[in-house]
Amino acid sequence: MVTTVQRTFRKEVLHALHKAKEVNHAVLISYSRQIESLDPLSFFNYGAKKYTGNRFFWSDPESELTIVGLGKEAVFQTNQKNSERYREVFEQWERFKKTAFHIYEEEKLQHSAVGPVLFGGFSFDPCEERGSQWDHFSEGDFFVPALMLTMTAEGPFLTVNRWVSGGEDAEAVLEGLKAFAAEFMVPDFKQEDQAVIAAAEELDKDDWLKAIETATSQIKEKQYDKVVLARELLLTFDGPIQIEPVLKTLLDDQQTSYVFAIEQEGKTFVGASPERLIKRDGGTVMSSCLAGSIKRGVNEEDDRRIGLELLNDEKNLLEHDIVVGMIHNAFVSSCSEVEKPDGPVLYKTKSVQHLFTPIVGQLRESASIFDLIEKLHPTPALGGSPQEKAVDVIREIEPMSRGWYAAPIGWIDSQDNGEFAVAIRSGLIEGSTARLFAGCGIVEDSEPISEYEETQIKLKPMISALGGERR
């Protein structure tokens, strides 16, 4: 467990240095303090030069919590091709916490997502034949940032993470940390003209439509119940794509979604997902069943009519029930108590309405958030049902490399609080190109053209964030 202290700053720096000398290797000091208001996008933009390729952005629905990480002070990685990848990251994190020191100035800094925080995500399927576009994205990639901004209802907090060795001078470490945190200022982010979409290509569209026909035939033959098939849109721009304007548009337009970005060696995976996979707050865990979708209406009356149509649509209700059942069973196996409502309600984003059922549980002491990620991913909303068979089908007939699309992405802090979203409504940006992804659930009576139109709707948030409709 991370040593968390509020006593005299100097004394605790000495404690950390003594520990480093005792174990004969460096330990991490994580120094947190409350600061004046600081814009998260400005902070993210500030890191573009010094920390380019090593930044992370996270904002939950309604921006109740925003976390921005710059640099990689500690890296946790796995290339395990099975479920052991979750345990490997968890065990690396547990070992790290044993020699990490969180030093803060005030009692109120004992806040979720302040101090040592692990950012990152996993691939959708570690056994897929990975496309080169996903180079540098491992089966699991996580890091503790060098600098971190945490925006909460209680205000903004800055965390500085630094390795120290037993031979360092305590006064130098002390003054260096305090001076950096006290004087930290960044220029305001200023919106610049974004590159313009020059070309758009729907990759393997015909193969994707044929895959739906194959899937519906197999489902009718009772080979499986459901599979989610995704497709890819390749956009080419007239210049390099800047990530900050993309994030700003997503934050402005997709306020009921998780907005995220993670950089890896010149590539940025970015998106606005409406779907929570798992959240842990103390002993309470929460997940969202989000399956079954339809477009928004042109006005309030039309929107209400379309929403009622979704709430009474047998295909979408069946698809939703499959997801609810799977998530509920996963919670029952890891929780002492589980609660879920009797039926779904509507969850509305700017472009899409979804059937939504929340599930809440009390996690057993022996379980971790990584245990639930392993049990939940991929849910039937992202893979299909039965889980293992659906993933096999995706490998066989889906004409794209998923990489991190539709996979868990999020954070966990030193107290094991954390949250992971499902990385949908997303895209992979590199230079002047953007690969956008969207999928839909295929069941027995799915129609290829109708499913294609559904993916068109789901692509809209990212197309808009990148500069508008295709030109």
From Swiss-Prot:
Its cofactor is Mg(2+). SUPFAM superfamilies: ADC synthase. The active site is at K226 (proton acceptor), E275 (proton donor). Pathway: Quinol/quinone metabolism; 1,4-dihydroxy-2-naphthoate biosynthesis; 1,4-dihydroxy-2-naphthoate from chorismate: step 1/7; Quinol/quinone metabolism; menaquinone biosynthesis. Keywords: Isomerase, Magnesium, Menaquinone biosynthesis, Metal-binding. Signal peptide: none annotated. It is an enzyme of class 5 (isomerase). It catalyses: chorismate = isochorismate. It comes from the Bacteria. One of its GO terms (biological process) is menaquinone biosynthetic process. Pfam families: Chorismate_bind. Its EC number is 5.4.4.2. InterPro entries: ADC_synthase (IPR005801), Chorismate_C (IPR015890), IsoChor_synthase (IPR004561), MenF (IPR034681). Transmembrane segments: none annotated. Mg(2+) binds at E319, E454. GO terms for molecular function: isochorismate synthase activity; magnesium ion binding. Catalyzes the conversion of chorismate to isochorismate. NCBIfam families: isochor_syn. Belongs to the isochorismate synthase family. This is Isochorismate synthase MenF. It comes from Bacillus subtilis (strain 168). The lineage of its organism: Bacteria, Bacillati, Bacillota, Bacilli, Bacillales.
